[in-house]
A protein has these predicted regions:
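Short linear sequence motifs
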Residues: 2-7, 30, 40, 44, ...
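Low-complexity, intrinsically disordered export/secretion signals at extreme N-termini
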Residues: 1-110, 126
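Active-site signature of cysteine proteases
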Residues: 5-30, 42-44, 299, 305-452
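Intrinsic-disorder/low-complexity regions
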Residues: 4-7, 11-14, 26, 39, ...
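Serine/threonine-rich low-complexity intrinsically disordered regions
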Residues: 5, 21-24, 36, 40, ...
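Active-site nucleophile-adjacent alpha helix/oxyanion-hole segment immediately C-terminal to the catalytic cysteine
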Residues: 65-97, 101-298, 357, 399
Length: 452
């Protein structure tokens, strides 16, 4: 995991403090859309590395597989049964691209038939997980209101009016969730099973080389982010992913009182877990606020935190490439590279089978950044005039389908992109992310002392 960043200020000034647009929790209509993009009805990305010809299975073979599938169809509602059939025919159900090689079917069976965390419902969890796998574009960051009958008890937890979250800061976590569902369905189902179980946690073995070239530097990162782990050798570590204690409260609300366009219980558990990882185990799901040593803002994740989280969730060496130059007054003053290089790097990553999570900014009439938001680029196409259109998933646009942005609109707004190491190293020198994190930590401590 690396970061390419020549200016510490631009690293600190970008943050998902606010979403670019949000639908109020009482509103069940899609947020108003600007004509900068158009809807795209596609359901799947053309290429997915998890489904190669060598491991694509679309037929139940063993008696165990048949028994599990039959049990699920007995439990499931009509829509879930339909989606299960789609997952089987497309190879998703029997995919075993998970950390422990369990299949999507194995984990869905556990979700449906074994005890869940208190207040969670097996049938609802099965429905939500299957729907997300069949249609990953349903992943959203819209919180939903606290049901009136639970407001007094929720406020008594010490969170007051902060529990009415209208503008979610979970776009980085929601983007990572979408990526996991679309690119690694068996692992998504494994996370859904573990996070909704009585233990409310998932263990995952990762390669330390996907965090840093040097083992000690990788261990520094794990310690800095305070994620529980066990390392018995210099090559791998077993990490424990878990949401904060209040995630179960929100997940219960979304189980019994979920409105249209709001997060599912699975969305809550996934996003709370990934926010907790990125915020150094300091996230509070009830208020959508965090603490942590790398960010002085209580909302969202900064670039460094998002890249760490993405790297450990996918167990891939991600490089955070920063494109925009931001001065100390949060003003956009230029770019680190030209748009042609930016476009080439994104397309190269897509051609490798990766989605690309980007952070983009909005500026006011003085070119000062006022908003930051994370979305996922899942594809691209070029017209006869050579102009490219990017196909994206936005977890905060009030739609359950892809959207399209022209290159002229999107490229100037991209602050950073999470790219595979092989892509970024072709065109630039990279700085390891643990170095970036240490420098930022020292800078924040210095700023705090000056204020104090």
């Amino acid at each position: 995991m690396y970061s390419y960043n020549l200016n510490n200020f631009q690293y600190n000034n970008y943050n998902t403090v606010k979403t670019v647009k949000a639908t109020p929790v009482e509103n069940e209509q899609p947020a108003p859309q600007k004509p900068s993009f158009t809807s795209n009805p596609i359901k799947q990305v053309p290429y997915n590395a998890a489904f190669t010809a060598s491991n694509l299975r679309t037929q139940l073979v063993s008696n165990d597989e048949k028994a599990k599938y039959n049990k699920l169809t007995q439990i499931a509602d009509k829509n879930t049964r339909k989606n299960l059939n789609i997952l089987l025919k497309t190879g998703v159900l029997l995919n075993s691209d998970s950390n422990d090689k369990s299949t999507t079917l194995d984990n869905l069976y556990l979700i449906a038939t074994t005890q869940r965390a208190q207040g969670l419902d097996n049938a609802v969890l099965l429905h939500d997980t299957v729907q997300t796998l069949a249609q990953p574009h349903v992943v959203t960051q819209q919180f939903g209101n606290v049901p009136k009958q639970f407001m007094a008890k929720t406020v008594a937890l010490g969170n007051g009016e902060d529990v009415n979250v209208e503008h979610s800061g979970t776009c980085p976590a929601a983007s990572i969730e979408f990526n996991l569902a679309q690119k690694h369905p068996a692992e998504f189902a494994r996370f859904a099973n573990g996070l909704s179980s009585p233990e409310m946690s998932v263990k995952k073995t990762i390669k330390l080389s996907n965090l840093a070239d040097n083992t000690l530097d990788a261990v520094w990162l794990l310690n800095a982010f305070e994620i529980p782990y066990k390392a018995d050798n210099f090559n791998e570590a077993e990490l424990t992913f878990a949401p904060d204690k209040n995630a179960l409260v929100r997940a219960y609300f979304q189980t019994v009182d979920r409105d249209k366009l709001e997060r599912s219980s699975i969305d809550v558990l996934m996003q709370s877990t990934f926010m907790n990882v990125g915020s150094q185990q300091s996230y509070n799901t009830l208020t959508d606020k965090r603490a942590g040593k790398f960010n002085q803002n209580p909302k969202g994740l900064i670039e460094f935190e998002k890249t760490f989280t993405e790297s450990v969730v996918e167990d891939k060496n991600k490089i955070s490439v920063t494109y925009q130059k931001i001065d100390e007054n949060a003003k956009l003053v230029g770019y680190e590279t030209d748009f042609a290089t930016m476009k080439k790097q994104i397309v190269d990553a897509l051609n490798m089978g990766d989605n690309v999570i980007i952070g983009y900014t909005q500026t006011d009439n003085t070119n000062t950044i006022v908003n930051g938001h994370e979305i996922t680029i899942i594809g691209a196409r070029t017209d006869k005039h050579g102009k490219m259109t990017f196909i994206c998933h936005d977890t905060d646009d009030g739609q359950s389908k892809p959207v399209e942005y022209s290159e002229d609109f999107l490229l100037p707004k991209i602050h950073h992109a999470g790219l595979p190491q092989k892509v970024a190293e072709k065109d630039m020198q990279v700085k390891e992310n643990w170095v970036e994190g240490l420098e930022t930590y020292k800078q924040l401590k210095k700023q705090y002392k000056n204020v104090a």
